[in-house]
Amino acid sequence: ISAIDKDKNVRIVAENLSNSTGVTYYDGDLYFSEVNSIWKIQNIDEVLLSSKQIPEKVLVTDNLPSDTWHGWKWIDFGPDNKLYVPVGAPCNICNPSLEEKYNFDKRYASIMRLNDGEWEYVARGVRNTVGFDWHPKTNNLYFGDNGRDWMGDDMPSCELNVVMNDDSFYGYPYKHSMDVLDPDYSKKIPDNVDEFIDPILELGAHVAPTGLSFYDGDHFPAKYKNTLFMTLHGSWNRSRKVGYKIKAVHFDENGELLYHKDFITGWLQKNKGQ
């Protein structure tokens, strides 16, 4: 991980990391992730503005699941000042909490929050989210979810979801998108699962939503206030490629979805995703 100091020099902040993807800033400290760990460097602004030696990283946690399939940890602090961490399913389709090969670990396929040193569930049944953000007015958490593969070109759809209540269940591995039952797992729904939370928007199969960010600035026209910008990485498991664009999802100040449209396109050329 690198940073630019006050003299515009690029400085290495941390190195020799394993799949470090999540980076966020909170209360003067820089936080970053590895697959099974989260670290921080304290007083990073003071260090970079004074050209002091960068201190050693401090361990926040090292007990997260270590599978690399959907194992990258995209991290951020919420409006409640708590650290949010998604844990993707270590497979295309499976039920890790019931399978010995995954140590019956219930943390897979979830979004968790670190609250005073203890982990708690924000959302479960989430296959693989690599982008989330909070509505600037309601503070509700919105997240994308990448749908499973090998069910054909057009199903199931990737999703945009909202968390209205903590520990809600969003369907994986039993149900996908609005009403697509999984051919392998829909007949194995346990008795304690009595509700699936539907997505607020189906994005299309295999488009792979990644980065999400609400806009609350003053530079764009007023119609973009409270708009969620989403990057769609694009497909691989499809005969004709889709995605490869940025979508704008417009909400009102109460968090109600108004409409959505493409914001930037043009990366998909000659149907090759190049």
Spans of model-derived segments:
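Short coil/turn segments at the loop-to-beta-strand junctions that recur within blades
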Residues: 17-21, 63-68, 126-130, 267-270
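Glycine-rich, histidine-containing beta strand-loop boundary motifs that form or position
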Residues: 5, 27, 34-36, 42, ...
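Asp-box/WD-like beta-propeller blade repeats and closely related beta-sheet repeat scaffolds
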Residues: 19, 36-78
